């Protein structure tokens, strides 16, 4: 059975991820304590189910300490992947402000009602709750595939989750992600490469509205020896250290490529690397600052 465990910071998009799994045919359960996952797995296995999606988070905090052992036990018989969703504190505070939902660890701090008569919560208390949750969940994040949703739209997150579940192979999945430094470095990256020193197509008015996936931009960058040299150096570095990540039983390795805006240079380099490494196994590519293709 393929089991995908969705966990992470409240408000980071776990419900969206679980809905994608459900739409893909996974048997899904939300807020299931860790100690019940093996029992559910045995039952579903006996009934012929082949895909299970479980969301577990701080709402079941009494059992979170058991999750690493649970994952190791399940992995002996099943294909198990843990996806940890996170976001910046500022992004989470904004989301809670927009939805007026209560953080699981927040406490009511005043009696002043919100605009619709709902209970109001102090932003300081909310930020403390978020940081407390972040600290409590940090051991889970270290052993999971992390996805930072801070600057990510809902439809983009759906697209990313669909990509992650597309291939049922148990081999390590290599993910190349382009991003713009002006929007922040992805917190889910295992390796980060800065390509801002490369010639920038942005300054060519004909290329400015295009992206690193468009032929004119590709032709421009491929004509620059400096671009090809840096792409080759990054390729060699990733290829040299990839076996150590495989030996560490990692499910995913995220390689982030950053330029200023995440539109031209980083997109081109990420696509070039992905095309090379596809011969080595499972490869995904995503462009954080671009709308999902299709």
UniProtKB/Swiss-Prot annotation:
NCBIfam families, sorted: PRK05416.1
Keywords: ATP-binding, GTP-binding, Nucleotide-binding
Protein name, as recorded: Nucleotide-binding protein H16_A0381
Organism: Cupriavidus necator (strain ATCC 17699 / DSM 428 / KCTC 22496 / NCIMB 10442 / H16 / Stanier 337) (Ralstonia eutropha)
Residues binding ATP, per UniProt: 8-15
Free-text function comment from the UniProt entry: Displays ATPase and GTPase activities.
Coiled-coil blocks: none
A Pfam family reported for this protein in Swiss-Prot or TrEMBL: PapZ_C
GO MF assignments: ATP binding; GTP binding
């Amino acid at each position: 059975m393929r089991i995908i465990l969705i966990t992470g910071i409240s408000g980071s998009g776990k419900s969206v991820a679980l809905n994608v799994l459900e739409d893909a045919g996974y048997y899904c359960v939300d807020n299931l304590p860790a100690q019940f996952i093996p029992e559910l797995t045995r039952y579903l296995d006996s009934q012929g189910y082949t895909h299970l999606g479980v969301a577990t988070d701080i709402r079941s905090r009494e059992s979170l300490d058991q999750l690493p052992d649970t994952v190791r036990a399940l992995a002996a018989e099943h294909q198990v992947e843990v996806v940890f969703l996170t976001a910046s504190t500022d992004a989470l505070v904004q989301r809670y402000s927009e939805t007026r939902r209560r953080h699981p660890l927040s406490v009511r701090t005043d009696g002043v009602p919100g605009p619709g008569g709902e209970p109001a919560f102090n932003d300081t208390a909310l930020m403390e709750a978020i940081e407390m949750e972040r600290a409590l969940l940090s051991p889970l994040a270290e052993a999971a595939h992390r996805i930072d949703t801070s600057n990510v739209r809902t439809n983009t997150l759906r697209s990313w989750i669909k990509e992650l579940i597309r291939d049922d192979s148990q081999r390590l999945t290599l993910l190349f992600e382009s991003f713009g430094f002006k929007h922040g470095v992805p917190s889910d990256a295992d390796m980060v490469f800065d390509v801002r020193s490369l010639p920038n197509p942005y300054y060519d008015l004909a290329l400015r509205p295009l992206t690193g996936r468009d032929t004119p931009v590709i032709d421009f960058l491929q004509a620059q020896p400096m671009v090809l040299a840096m792409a080759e150096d990054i390729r060699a570095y990733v290829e040299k250290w990839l076996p150590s990540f495989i030996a560490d039983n990692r499910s995913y390795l995220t390689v982030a490529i950053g330029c200023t805006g995440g539109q031209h240079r980083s997109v081109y380099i990420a696509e070039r690397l992905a095309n090379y490494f596809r011969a080595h196994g499972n490869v995904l590519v995503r462009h954080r600052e671009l709308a999902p293709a299709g």
